[in-house]
């Protein structure tokens, strides 16, 4: 490709509304341009990267035995009504009517469509298992699109769906897809973790997220320092170790009129925060027990996903309001605690090991100090309620936990029969009777993968693609002052034709631009290998080579240039 025949839309300045690095660099590199909130045009440089990412995904999916299909973006509402998600899905589901007043949606996902397709096309257990995938546009009407294509309203996804007669068959495909995803992200050159995850609105049982580690990520990824354990913070088990110490002081009632938060209590009374507990009041699952107290250590955070799995707690978790709390307990938030509490309480594992701790007295403006379980208050039910923190023991007993930010780029689920039962997707079983199919689903955010690669791999000059396979161009030819030097132009043209004939994805910068501008643009878009042709060096029989990833520069004899490039690229 010649730059003179290419839409090369780089920007010198960073747009003010771009907050994260990937958004900034994708705009500056001329990969995307905004059209409306959360909607983007993909320019030639962006499309080249996108198609290369898709190529890797297709190759690995095909190796894993998946078969490609293509399903409509526009989906009839009756399929969503049949699955039960028409009412469950929130406003991010874009609904509309056609000219015949029929209801449709713009698909945020395709479980309903694929289930409908398979129940029409597959009739016997002999046709299973099947694993079908597509790479298709999705639309979710995000309330606050942000971070460029990282969280846009329209995006491209690879979504796959597998169908089985048994849970064992699903597990086999799930394991294959886990490895396929690992292969994809390894080929992309990404530093990622496969983590245990919550199934969320998709539903189902087992689930893993594939998280690219990056400071701009929106998820907290927890992993062990010494083992393969990794989990989303929502799912990571908090292990409490040690034994509860014996009491050392008598419980006392203390006036605390100005201590309405844990931090105020700690500051005003010079207490160690790890010797305090906080009591959170949530709605109960049983109308006979409308409020439930959740008690965690003062420096810990409640894990709402874990808490709402307790049978006494309403799912989804909902906090009680001030009026409800005051009416039932007789005290306001900030003065609540375990002693003389008149509603069911659940305490975190760490709290169960505490002694001589401080908590609200359930009397406004008062706290109890030096509280001890069994002596001063009966031990409530113990449950894992908190988020893990760095330094906690790994749940598998190997090493301690680290926490980093992550960008979710892939997610695999064992759906089970959630959709197939609702939509009556059955086949004839071996015994001749109808058998409800068991399902799995497997998604990759293709456009998000591009952004996450940039988040993880860049410098102050621009993008550094982690793999040559996804760079928009593999080699850049930069002839200095070509339009003033016949020898430079002749050699550059010959090299360009040679590389093209050998299948190298090469960009030839034949613009009438200053060398500094040409260098800056090629570094900005992240071309991994740059060949710089100058008249003086050419007269000496040498060509300059620059490696974008390592920063390495070297002079190469022009007679050996192709063989050296062959070695560096590994594909000539």
UniProtKB/Swiss-Prot annotation:
Stored CDD domains: ProRS-INS, ProRS_anticodon_short, ProRS_core_prok
Annotated SUPFAM superfamilies: Class II aaRS ABD-related, Class II aaRS and biotin synthetases, YbaK/ProRS associated domain
Entry domain remark: Consists of three domains: the N-terminal catalytic domain, the editing domain and the C-terminal anticodon-binding domain.
EC numbers on record: 6.1.1.15
Compartment annotation: Cytoplasm
Lineage: Bacteria, Pseudomonadati, Pseudomonadota, Gammaproteobacteria, Pasteurellales
Top-rank taxon, per record: Bacteria
Pfam families associated with the record: HGTP_anticodon (PF03129), tRNA-synt_2b (PF00587), tRNA_edit (PF04073)
Keywords, comma-separated and alphabetical: Aminoacyl-tRNA synthetase, ATP-binding, Cytoplasm, Ligase, Nucleotide-binding, Protein biosynthesis
Catalytic activity: tRNA(Pro) + L-proline + ATP = L-prolyl-tRNA(Pro) + AMP + diphosphate
Entry's Gene Ontology cellular component terms: cytosol
Family, similarity comment: Belongs to the class-II aminoacyl-tRNA synthetase family. ProS type 1 subfamily.
Gene Ontology molecular function: any one: proline-tRNA ligase activity
Classification via Gene3D superfamilies: Anticodon-binding domain (3.40.50.800), Bira Bifunctional Protein, Domain 2 (3.30.930.10)
Keyword Oxidoreductase on entry: no
Role according to the record: Catalyzes the attachment of proline to tRNA(Pro) in a two-step reaction: proline is first activated by ATP to form Pro-AMP and then transferred to the acceptor end of tRNA(Pro). As ProRS can inadvertently accommodate and process non-cognate amino acids such as alanine and cysteine, to avoid such errors it has two additional distinct editing activities against alanine. One activity is designated as 'pretransfer' editing and involves the tRNA(Pro)-independent hydrolysis of activated Ala-AMP.
Biological process terms in GO annotation: prolyl-tRNA aminoacylation
Self-association state and partner proteins as the record states: Homodimer.
Chief location of this protein within or outside the cell: cytoplasm
The protein, known as: Proline--tRNA ligase
Gene label: proS
């Amino acid at each position: 490709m010649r730059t003179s025949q290419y839409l090369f839309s780089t920007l010198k300045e960073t747009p003010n509304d771009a907050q994260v690095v990937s958004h900034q660099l994708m705009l500056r590199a001329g990969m995307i341009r905004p059209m409306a909130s959360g909607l983007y045009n993909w320019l030639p440089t962006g499309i080249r990267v996108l198609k290369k990412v898709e190529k890797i995904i297709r190759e690995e999916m095909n190796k894993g035995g998946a078969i490609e299909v293509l399903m409509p973006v526009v989906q009839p509402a009756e399929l969503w009504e049949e699955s039960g998600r028409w009412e469950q899905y929130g406003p991010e589901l874009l609904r509309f009517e056609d000219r015949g007043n029929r209801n449709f949606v713009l698909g945020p996902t395709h479980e309903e469509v694929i289930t409908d397709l398979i129940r029409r096309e597959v009739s016997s257990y002999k046709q299973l298992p099947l694993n079908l995938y597509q790479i298709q546009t999705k639309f979710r009407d995000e309330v606050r699109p942000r971070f460029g294509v990282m969280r846009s309203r329209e995006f491209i996804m690879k979504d796959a769906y597998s169908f089985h007669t048994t849970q064992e068959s699903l597990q086999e495909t799930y394991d294959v897809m886990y490895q396929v995803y690992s292969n994809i992200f390894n080929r992309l050159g990404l530093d990622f973790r496969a983590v245990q995850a919550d199934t969320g609105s998709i539903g189902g049982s087992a689930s893993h997220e594939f998280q690219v580690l990056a400071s701009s990520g929106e998820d907290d990824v927890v992993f062990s320092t010494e083992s393969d354990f990794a989990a989303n913070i929502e799912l990571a088990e908090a292990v409490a170790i040690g034994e509860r110490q014996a009491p050392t002081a008598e419980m006392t009632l203390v006036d605390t009129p100005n201590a309405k938060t844990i931090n105020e209590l700690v500051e005003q009374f010079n207490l160690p925060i790890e010797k305090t507990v906080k009591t959170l009041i949530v709605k109960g699952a049983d109308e006979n027990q409308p409020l439930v107290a959740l008690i965690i250590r003062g420096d810990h955070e409640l894990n709402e996903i874990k808490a709402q799995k307790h049978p006494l707690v309403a799912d989804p978790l909902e906090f009680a309001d001030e009026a409800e709390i005051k009416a039932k307990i007789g005290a306001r938030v900030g003065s609540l605690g375990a002693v003389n509490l008149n509603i069911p309480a659940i305490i975190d594992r760490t709290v169960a090991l505490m002694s001589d701790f401080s908590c609200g007295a359930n009397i406004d403006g008062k706290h109890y100090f030096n509280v001890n379980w069994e002596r001063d208050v009966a031990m409530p039910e113990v449950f894992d309620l908190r988020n893990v923190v760095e330094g906690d023991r790994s749940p598998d007993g190997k090493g301690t936990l680290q926490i980093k930010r992550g960008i979710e780029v892939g997610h695999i689920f064992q759906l089970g029969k959630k959709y197939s039962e609702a939509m009556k997707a059955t086949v004839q079983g071996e015994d001749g009777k109808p058998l409800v199919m068991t399902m799995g689903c497997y998604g990759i955010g293709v456009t998000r993968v591009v952004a996450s690669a940039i988040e993880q791999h860049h410098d102050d000059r621009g993008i550094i693609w982690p793999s040559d396979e996804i760079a928009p161009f593999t080699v850049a030819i930069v002839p200095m002052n070509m339009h003033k030097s016949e020898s430079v132009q002749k050699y550059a043209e010959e090299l360009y034709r040679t590389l093209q004939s050998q299948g190298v994805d090469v960009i030839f910068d034949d613009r009438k631009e200053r060398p500094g501008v040409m260098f800056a643009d090629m570094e900005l878009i992240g071309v991994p290998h740059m060949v710089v042709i100058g008249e003086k060096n050419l007269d000496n029989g040498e060509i300059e080579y620059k490696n974008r990833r390592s920063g390495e520069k070297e002079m190469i004899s022009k007679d050996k240039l192709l063989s050296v490039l062959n070695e560096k690229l590994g594909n000539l």
